Amino acid sequence: MKQEASEQARKGQAGSLLERLRFAGLDEDACALLRDHRQALSPRIELALRALSHRLQASPDAARHFDSDRQIDRLHDLQSSHWNVLTDARFDGLYAERVKVLADTESRMGLDPRWQIASHAIVLEHLILGAIEDAWPKSILSLGKARRRELRDLVAALVRAAFVDTEIAVSLRFNALRQQHQRQLSEQRRDDESELKTLFADFLRALGEGDLTARLPEDAPDTYQPIVAGLNTALGQIRDALLAADKRATAAEAIVSDLRGSAAEFSGNAGAEAKAIDQHLVSLGTVTERIRTGSIRIGETEAQASRTRIAVERSGEIAGQAISAMADIEASAEKIGQIIGVIDEIAFQTNLLALNAGIEAARAGESGRGFAVVAQEVRALAQRSGEAAREIKQLVTGTKGQVVAGVEIVGRTQHAISSIAEQVVSINEAVTGIAREAECQVNDLASATSEIGGVAQAMNRSAALAGAALASTDDLHGVIVELGETIRRFHLDRQARSAASFAPRMRIEAPEDETTSPFGEVTSERHLAGWRR
């Protein structure tokens, strides 16, 4: 379908071009003549385009359309290509393409058609003058040169005058068409605005009053049918959405009320629990401190028990040393007894010897009396030595018995000390175990205190969050209530107005069980109940 339309447009353009060529008298012979002189015309065209570029740069009115010299060079290249195709005089698709490219480029640059006419005038002037120059017979006479110069000036003046007149006429016509087009656009705009006001005024007034049952008439002009249908559909969807939002807002209001109660209760409970946990945390800290103090004292007791164990062990060692010393004393007493026995035997033998000496002295008579006295003294000394030996033996025997009793007592003491040492070791081990358990309990209580402190902080944060949630639910409740009131300000009842027969200016009588709101719409008891809520 598009290809057919494009083909028809192309044929129409070709027919229009042929008609223009026919009207201008450009038949095949004229086109062939142009092609024959194409090589001679090309240098003249290039000179003319250079002159055109200089004039465009020198003219302030023309130069303001160009941002840089590169745009002028670009225009020069396009015009050179255009004149190259034009002097080929075939007027085919390539020519149409070149014409369109040049026209689009000049349009983008903001050049009016007057500049196109002026550029053609300059090129045509150079071409005509060049043709006259080439065709004029060479003459050495000054009269011929003067006539040639006069003819050139005349032709140039005629070309300039004709194209200036054409440019002015085209500019005036173009301005007139543009003004006419602007007037037509203004009139069309006023007509459209008037039609839009007629079509939308009552509709917009009803919407401003909050009546969402208002609809645009279905017999609107075809131009506005898509807008009318779209607006009516959109309003229907908005009405349905607001009705659903009204129901959901009512349900949300009830839910938020429940949430407010739950949040308030949770906030109170969380605060009370946080205070209770803080109190328990203080008590637990006191208990932990007491257990830590007890643990320190248990450690001191453990050290004291260790010192006691060492002292008892030393006492056992001393008792052992005492037993060893008493054993040595007993051995010495035994030896002393033996020595005393020897002394007693010596005293007995000495007594016998003294007795025998006395007997012998008595037998000797007077000569042995001195010896008898000595013997008597020796006997007395022997008796005293024997008595002393017996006394010492009795003392040594008593001492030996006492030493044996002391050894037995010291042995029992050593056994008791050993038992005490074992008990002290057991007590020390028990105290060490108690100290370790106390230290573990202190660490466990410290961990429990830290965890309970974390729980207390969490409860405090929960209480704060609950308070914030309560405040948020209060705000949300207020927002939902305001949303419900805002929704209920709109007129959403379809029975009050008919979408098909919308008459914005017609006054609607409210039933007896309905009330007219300050917005001018009919408000049902259900809406009033929502407002009361």
Swiss-Prot record:
One of its GO terms (biological process) is chemotaxis. The gene is mcpE. InterPro entries: Chemotax_Me-accpt_rcpt, Globin-like_sf, Globin-sensor_dom, Globin/Proto, HAMP_dom, MCP_chemotaxis, MCPsignal_dom, Protoglobin_sensor_dom. Residues 523-533 have a biased composition (Basic and acidic residues). Keywords: Chemotaxis, Transducer. The lineage of its organism: Bacteria, Pseudomonadati, Pseudomonadota, Alphaproteobacteria, Hyphomicrobiales. This is Probable chemoreceptor McpE. Residues 248-477 form the Methyl-accepting transducer domain. CDD domains: globin_sensor, MCP_signal. The keyword Cytoplasm does not apply. SUPFAM superfamilies: Globin-like (SSF46458), Methyl-accepting chemotaxis protein (MCP) signaling domain (SSF58104). Residues 501-533 are annotated as: Disordered. The keyword Chloroplast does not apply. Pfam families: MCPsignal, Protoglobin. One of its GO terms (molecular function) is oxygen binding. It comes from the Bacteria. Belongs to the methyl-accepting chemotaxis (MCP) protein family. It comes from Rhizobium meliloti (strain 1021) (Ensifer meliloti). GO terms for cellular component: membrane.
